Amino acid sequence: MKTYSLLFLILSFPLCIFAQTRAITDTGQEVMLNSDGTYTYVNKEEAAAVNIPTNSTEFSKSESASFLLKSKRVNVGFWLDPKLWSFGEPQDNPDAEYEVALKGEDLYGVIITEKIEVPLETMKNIALQNARQIAPDVHVVKQEYRMVNGQKVLYLELFGTMDGMKIAYAGYFFSNSSGTVQFITFTSQNLLEEYREHSQQLINGLVSLS
C-alpha cells in the first residue's frame, strides 16, 4: 500500500476549525460546533441520550516499548518498540508531527498534536465532521473511554472509504492543559484484526509528560 501517505488526510485536520457549524453526529443528533471546541445540541433532549462507555481495564505501555518519542508541541510522549516501528517527521502531511509504520507490513500511524486544549467529550463529533469532508461514509464502529498510563483518553475505531479503499482507523484522542493529541493507526479493513495487537500496543505507549 505505497499510497498510504494520502490516507493521513482523512483524520489530519485540526480539531478546532469550526465556528457555529451545524453537524450531525454518528447517532443522528444535530449539534452546533463552536470555535472553542465545544458543541451544543440543537435538540436539548437528545443530550442525555448520548453515552460513551468506559472500559474498566487499565491500559499501559508494552514492556518492549523501549524508546520514548517526545512531542515538540505538547507535553506528551509515545513509547514504542524501535525494532518493530519506523518513525519520523511527516513528508506530505504538515498537520502531523510524526508518522510511524510497522516495518515490512501494511499498518501505519500518525501523531497529530495541537496546542489548543479541547474537551474530551467533544472530540468524537469534531473528528467525524472533519473526516467526512473527505470520506463522507466515515462512521464509528467502536467507542469508549480508557485509562491509559494513568490518563483518561477517548478510543475510537472508525471505518471509511477513500478512492475505493476501505480503511479502518483505531486510535486515541487526548487533551490536557498543554494541548491535544490524536494518535491514530490505520490499515485496510480486511487487515484490522490481523494487526489489532500491534495497533493496540503502539497506541498504549501514549503518556503525559506534564
Over which residues does each language-model region extend?
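A short acidic-to-branched-hydrophobic micro-motif
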Residues: A96-N125, V181
